[in-house]
Amino acid sequence: AGEAIRDLLATLSFTQVFSPRTYLGTKINGVLWTAAVEMQFYLLFPLLARCFRKKPLLTYLSMLGASLLFVYGVSLPRPEQLRMLQNQLPAFLSVFANGMAAAYVYTLSEKRLAARPIRLLPLFLLPVIAFSLVLLNRIRHGAAGAELLPAYQMAMRYPLSLVFTLLLLALSFSGRVGRALLGNRILRFFAAISYELYIWHQWIAVR
């Protein structure tokens, strides 16, 4: 009973990733570690957002530097601890930085494009979209040949999020093409249920 209560309290407080017992040994849905990392980030977000508005490049580089230091300086040199280290908040700061940068670039560019639209912009973005898809495919295939999958995942997390950022920005500015791909009813439906689907898929699959 004590272990179950500890497991439950850690999950409800979004602190389960801090202990091997409640993270690696949890009897609750294992994918809920993502909610813990996100909630920890939300605690920092008001400060980071304020810094990003004032000094976007410095804030981005600071988040990226902290994340890469944790990945390459702390985690990857300790392969025996990777399962515990790979999904801690510092490892994701670079991913969150890309998301904040994407929002910043989109907001800034949208205002300028509204004032001075570039009609041929979607045509220029099509090669960017194609290139991004090629990179995503290469990263996906690289995982199959990785000697240590957690190490590969940690090393590729920032490049992968960078490719996704590039792809989403390109699609967002690709006019009717982007709206057809991202704004249709089917994708809007899956967008609405995507996180719930992610939370339940492993729990159902392993049973």
Predicted regions and their residues:
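Extracytosolic (periplasmic/ER-lumenal) interhelical loops and adjacent juxtamembrane/interface segments
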Residues: 4-23
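Alpha-helical membrane-protein architecture signal
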Residues: 5, 25-29, 94, 183
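Hydrophobic transmembrane-helix microenvironments that flank and shape a buried ionizable site
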Residues: 8, 13, 34-37, 89-92, ...
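Alpha-helical transmembrane segments
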Residues: 11, 60-68, 124-129
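Membrane-interface helix caps and helix-loop-helix hairpins in membrane proteins
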Residues: 24-28, 77-86, 147-151
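Specific transmembrane alpha-helix
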Residues: 34-50, 63-114, 131-132, 156-179
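Membrane-interfacial entry segments at the cytosolic side of transmembrane helices
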Residues: 54-62, 111-124
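Alpha-helical transmembrane segments of multi-pass integral membrane proteins
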Residues: 92, 96, 100, 121-207
